[in-house]
């Protein structure tokens, strides 16, 4: 993985991540420019399957002031994901199970400077699971603090 552009931190907190995939995105030139400028947010975004194809919904890619309105893009529009058919079929089967979904994790430039998105098959966490994660995180932080003193 190359340079990280945006990360969906909420997905790491709300879901158990099972299997990760790398996907390409179908984007316009104005969207690429906005992504390079860092005007992207994956919070509240999700992935749906429409007629055997994967789409990213509700991902915010802001407009640049320098882009002419004729070439401008939708800020929260749907964007097609580029995946192999076997990967899409695997994800569709996983989503059909109860409690499973596909979530976007992070947007980044790969080694060839192409925008990629990392997505994962995920299972939703219960409230007690989230509490346990927070407790473990606090304990780990306290341990590191105490180790730092010695």
Curated annotation (Swiss-Prot):
Record-linked CDD domains: SmpB (cd09294)
A GO CC term assigned to this protein in UniProt: cytosol
PROSITE patterns: SSRP
This protein's UniProt keywords: Cytoplasm, RNA-binding
Highest taxon, organism lineage: Bacteria
Entry's localization field: Cytoplasm
Predominant localisation class: cytoplasm
Physiological role: Required for rescue of stalled ribosomes mediated by trans-translation. Binds to transfer-messenger RNA (tmRNA), required for stable association of tmRNA with ribosomes. tmRNA and SmpB together mimic tRNA shape, replacing the anticodon stem-loop with SmpB. tmRNA is encoded by the ssrA gene; the 2 termini fold to resemble tRNA(Ala) and it encodes a 'tag peptide', a short internal open reading frame. During trans-translation Ala-aminoacylated tmRNA acts like a tRNA, entering the A-site of stalled ribosomes, displacing the stalled mRNA.
Name of the molecule in the record: SsrA-binding protein
């Amino acid at each position: 993985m190359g340079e990280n552009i945006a990360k969906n931190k909420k997905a790491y907190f709300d879901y158990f991540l099972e299997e990760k995939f790398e996907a390409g995105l179908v984007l316009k030139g104005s969207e690429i420019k906005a992504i390079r400028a860092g005007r992207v947010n994956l919070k509240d975004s999700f992935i749906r399957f429409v007629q055997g194809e994967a789409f990213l919904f509700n991902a915010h890619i802001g407009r640049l002031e320098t882009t002419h309105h004729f070439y401008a893009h939708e800020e929260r529009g749907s964007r097609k994901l580029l995946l192999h058919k076997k990967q899409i079929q695997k994800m569709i089967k996983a989503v059909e199970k109860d409690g499973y979904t596909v979530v976007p994790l992070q947007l980044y430039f790969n080694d060839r400077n192409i925008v990629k998105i990392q997505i994962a098959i995920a299972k939703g966490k219960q409230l007690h699971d989230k509490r346990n994660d927070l407790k473990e995180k606090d304990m780990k932080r306290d341990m590191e603090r105490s180790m730092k003193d010695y």
